[in-house]
């Protein structure tokens, strides 16, 4: 799901026949091997938090944010498996289904912003979770009271912030384009100076800074000799910073070089794996 027209050699304006259709089908199935279990796991987590034990978790800020993160992950993976990667990696579907997206632009008006919202949301929810944990560690005796007080404020804020990043995709014109036999969507920015890549990159920088700062503060405020908690906190921080850094490198690379003739094709495929690090992790 790209921001503007790139200069790919195999880019076209209609479905094209390619000899290695099975190769791209296999890419989809390889992605599905880890995305389907992740989808099932997120659905199970949601059932636990909001159905089976809703009374226990509903007033806890951290678990409320985790619930939000889980819902977004479910939507994200569902869109990947049923729309985005399906129609990119299955050229067999291109002639029929691309026409639906072209003739009924409302489909892309909904799916394109929603998909990018899910991508950005992980940056916000993970930052909110680590800040919530920091609050629990610094003020353990008041954590329940603070949780009940802050939940009505934090949850709407966490939902709203990603909208700032994807707002230009909501109001901009979308276009169906064709690549390697499949198709996907781009948008032509209504406000040229507002880039999805640059805004997301800004959020990523803040998320990395928040994770590093919060993790250091959590370790400092943990009870002495609590090595297991310290190790888990450090591992979580390292993995999160690594995942966000990968996204940051991609957004930087894409923002700087996407219009160059030598821009490599594998970057489009690689972006899915980069974002999957945080979705699956």
Task: Please name every model-derived segment.
Residues 1-281:
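Seven-transmembrane-like multi-pass membrane architecture, highlighting hydrophobic TM helices
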């Amino acid at each position: 799901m790209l921001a503007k027209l790139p200069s790919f050699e195999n880019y076209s304006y209609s479905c094209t026949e390619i000899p290695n259709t099975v190769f791209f089908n296999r890419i989809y199935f390889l992605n599905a091997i880890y995305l389907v279990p992740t989808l099932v796991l997120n659905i199970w987590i949601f059932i636990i938090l909001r159905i089976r034990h809703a009374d226990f978790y509903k007033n806890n800020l951290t678990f409320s944010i985790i619930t939000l993160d889980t819902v977004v992950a479910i939507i994200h993976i569902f869109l990947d498996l049923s729309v985005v990667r399906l129609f990119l990696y299955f050229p067999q579907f291109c002639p029929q289904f691309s026409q639906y997206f072209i003739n009924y632009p409302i489909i892309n008006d909904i799916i394109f912003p929603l998909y990018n919202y899910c991508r950005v949301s992980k940056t916000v929810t993970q930052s909110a979770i680590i800040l919530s944990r920091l609050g629990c560690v610094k003020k353990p005796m008041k954590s329940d009271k603070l949780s009940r007080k802050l939940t009505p404020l934090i949850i709407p804020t966490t939902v709203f912030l990603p909208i700032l990043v994807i707002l230009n995709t909501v109001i901009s014109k979308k276009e169906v384009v064709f690549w390697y036999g499949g198709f996907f969507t781009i948008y032509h920015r209504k406000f040229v100076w507002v880039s999805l890549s640059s805004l997301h990159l800004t959020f990523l920088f803040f998320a990395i800074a928040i994770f590093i700062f919060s993790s250091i503060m959590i370790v400092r405020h943990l009870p002495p000799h609590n090595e297991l908690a310290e190790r888990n906190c450090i591992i979580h921080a390292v993995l999160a910073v690594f995942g966000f850094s990968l996204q940051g490198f991609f957004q930087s690379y894409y923002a700087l070089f996407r219009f160059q003739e030598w821009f490599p094709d594998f970057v489009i495929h690689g972006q899915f794996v980069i974002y999957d690090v945080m979705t699956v992790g």
